[in-house]
Amino acid sequence: MARYLGPKAKLSRREGTDLFLKSARRAISDKAKFDSKPGQHGRTSGTRTSDFGLQLREKQKVKRMYGVLEKQFRRYFEEADRRKGNTGANLLFILESRLDNVVYRMGFGSTRAEARQLVSHKAITVNGNSVNIPSYMVKTGDVIAVRDKSKKQTRVTEALELAKQVGLPAWVDVNADKGEGVFKKVPDRDEFAADVNESLIVELYSR
């Protein structure tokens, strides 16, 4: 299955929430109206979505948010289920540990898609070694850096400037001048993705 290359705001409207796919970290109201689904008439009133429909929608939302396709998402779920603790939370921890997501969280890319491009184009190093695999799992203490020749790219400097304005999450420590950061820890569940109900995804895969 190929990645979706159409309008990004349309996906956010379909899920009813900002997936942070389009441009950097602007407010939802600045991007599009997410209270109606795409299409001529938008959301149909008076209809009730089935439990299965709600579960499927939540899975689609998280897949699109992190830019992961079904086969890989299923593997992540199976890994999360094998780990100790809450399966749903474990799934989100795995997604948050992807290199492309960490690059995004550190402010080197204004969207996860842009961060994924930086990784794929060999603009990112992990502990001094070039890594061009977006799904690479970052570990606590890993140092993520933008390679010297890429630091002055407009998209990188603009993303860092924006990150400076809106702030960075507590689980990363970034030196913007050096273009590098440390992944301090896997975030606690209450530190991110407040609008995600991962239990629905667990219910879906447990059918």
Swiss-Prot record:
Domain of life: Bacteria
Role, per record: One of the primary rRNA binding proteins, it binds directly to 16S rRNA where it nucleates assembly of the body of the 30S subunit.
GO biological process, one term: ribosomal small subunit biogenesis
Family membership: Belongs to the universal ribosomal protein uS4 family.
Alphabetical list of CDD domains matching this protein: S4
UniProt xrefs under PROSITE patterns: RIBOSOMAL_S4, S4
SUPFAM superfamilies: Alpha-L RNA-binding motif (SSF55174)
Keywords of the record: Ribonucleoprotein, Ribosomal protein, RNA-binding, rRNA-binding
GO molecular function, one term: structural constituent of ribosome
HAMAP family reported in the protein's UniProt record: Ribosomal_uS4_B
InterPro entries: Ribosomal_uS4, Ribosomal_uS4_bac-type, Ribosomal_uS4_CS, Ribosomal_uS4_N, S4_RNA-bd, S4_RNA-bd_sf
A Pfam family recorded for this sequence: Ribosomal_S4
Protein's UniProt name: Small ribosomal subunit protein uS4
Quaternary assembly: Part of the 30S ribosomal subunit. Contacts protein S5. The interaction surface between S4 and S5 is involved in control of translational fidelity.
Gene Ontology terms: cellular component: small ribosomal subunit
Organism: Polaromonas sp. (strain JS666 / ATCC BAA-500)
Disordered: annotated segments: 31-53
